[in-house]
Amino acid sequence: MKLVSFSAALLSVVSISGYANETLQLDPSLSTVGWKGTKKMGSAHNGEVKVKSGSVSFDKSGQLTGGSFVIDMKSITNEDLKGSPDYQKKLVGHLSSADFFDVEKHPTASFKITQVKPNKKSKNEMTIAGDFTMIGKTQQVSFPAKVTYSKGKANGEAVVKIDRTKFGLKYGSGNFFKELTADKIISDEFELTLKLAAKK
């Protein structure tokens, strides 16, 4: 899936004193996960999936201590083919099928933070690591994120690169199907652009 505020946005190590331990809930109405997938020849598709739920925790110094979120895989949409509704519907149907995300069997994907590494040069920037679960398989991913936290609210942004083949999603992969011509090869990696918002 071309993979997501998807959750990195909730992890911030901000050296602010005066906060009590606090857990904030993701606001699905203010959070988005965008996806982008590409082919070897350069073409690309993009769209969104909805955030279903999630939370993030900060300690009394304002430092992120944990977080997680759930994505509704049945909500996948496409944006770049709006001018071709028949093709758009076909693409979304294919992405939802067993060739890709098999959303009937696996209606959600999720991420759980396992580590936050602060950026010493910027209090709002960090590297987040955690367990990403998709299609019934879990792999660790890490990515840079920018997060702000103040007065019971948090916002975060990140771009996460996912190697779909590590989750068993091998359709169209040139690394697994050597007979594919270049115009049929789909990149193993896709991107999720996360823009997440949380509040009490």
Locations of regions flagged by a protein language model:
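Low-complexity, acidic/polar, glycine-enriched regions of mature
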Residues: 20-200
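N-terminal signal peptide c-region/cleavage motif recognized by signal peptidases
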Residues: 15-17
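Bacterial N-terminal signal peptides that target proteins for export
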Residues: 1-7
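Residue-level detector of intrinsically disordered, flexible termini
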Residues: 7-8, 19
